[in-house]
């Protein structure tokens, strides 16, 4: 999901989030590892390799830190803050790198029986464009079985349109190995902007010193 939750990876543990996103004209391959070394902080560094029919290959690199202020509980709303940066390296060497800085505040509201609503409010600074824009997201999780979860979200950035995703998550190994698949599009746009994703998430037990 693009809409983040307020949780972080377990203390002294790590995770790897990876996925492939396919559209009619592009293919993205993402991998973002993250670890919690303590202090209720999750550090992540990763990126993608993207191929587009019209511009060739583009790379994205990101680094971020997520601070959890209030853990999500059975009757407790969780709150976190994320600060990060993303660097875009265009396929055409004549174009300069683009760098964005972003802030996001994820809030997770528990509804009981492992049902959750996630609310995001944020801001992004596009260095090359010289603009600042608000960002937002609303997402939800609904368990269908002990291992299968339905997910849905809508999110956007000011002046960039509203997008949505629908999909499923499945635990292959509870709390350790999860796969997911989604379908998404931009609201009011033709089919050529739609996308499909397939993802894999790996979570480790605590092992860091």
Predicted segments with their positions:
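Transmembrane beta-barrel domains of Gram-negative outer membranes and organellar outer membranes
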Residues: 1-209
